[in-house]
């Protein structure tokens, strides 16, 4: 495993390379993109003797389930807009993710979702299910097979979580580099577990 010294200690070169290739591919294919950084958490499972208060779906493939749920929500939103005679744009979904563990051993994910900016730009309010923020949140709860109201706070949108990559804008290079720097966090060795047979990093596949 080749590594390099980065912003958060030792980083994995292969992960950085995959991120770079994906962003390069997307910005050549889509002149306007938005990237959204999100943190995803598992619920706290409280076991009081015979009473376990939470039964999430923790089977392998939770990111794949989340991705497919979000794709379905995006398609449903597209269908609704067609019915309402609104203009629609092609919006494939791309994702970069890293699986990490806290000092207490609790698993969490750092992800970046990329969308066609012509299709989606605003994240929307926290209390709505039909905007981009709500669809992302709902997709994670669907992947865990949990109700949002029963287990709030499992999806966190960190400060300055949205990046606009407009290749025709004068600030494109600045925003592009800022996103690369932000995503460098996902490539760090610290907090990841290796050798357990489970992946700790993933990136949408592209045809080069």
From Swiss-Prot:
It holds the Pfam family YagK_YfjJ_C. It comes from the Bacteria. To E.coli YfjJ. This is Uncharacterized protein YagK. It comes from Escherichia coli (strain K12). The lineage of its organism: Bacteria, Pseudomonadati, Pseudomonadota, Gammaproteobacteria, Enterobacterales.
């Amino acid at each position: 495993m080749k590594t390099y010294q980065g912003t958060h200690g030792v980083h994995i070169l292969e992960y950085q390379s995959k991120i770079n290739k994906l962003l390069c591919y997307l910005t050549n294919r889509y002149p306007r993109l938005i990237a959204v950084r999100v943190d995803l958490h598992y619920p706290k499972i409280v076991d009081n003797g015979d009473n376990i208060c939470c039964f999430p779906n923790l089977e392998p493939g939770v990111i794949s389930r989340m991705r497919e749920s979000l794709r379905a929500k995006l398609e449903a939103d597209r269908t609704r807009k067609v019915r309402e005679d609104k203009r629609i744009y092609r919006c494939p979904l791309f994702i970069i993710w890293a699986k990490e563990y806290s000092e207490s051993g609790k698993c969490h994910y750092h992800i970046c979702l990329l969308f066609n900016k012509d299709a989606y730009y605003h994240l929307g309010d926290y209390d709505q299910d039909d905007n981009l923020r709500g669809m992302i949140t709902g997709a994670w709860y669907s992947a865990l097979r949990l109700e949002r109201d029963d287990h709030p706070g499992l999806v966190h949108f960190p400060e300055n979580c949205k990046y606009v990559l407009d290749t025709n804008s004068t600030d494109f290079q600045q925003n592009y580099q800022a996103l690369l720097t932000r995503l460098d966090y996902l490539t760090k060795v610290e907090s990841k577990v290796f050798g357990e047979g489970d992946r700790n990093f993933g990136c949408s596949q592209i045809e080069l």
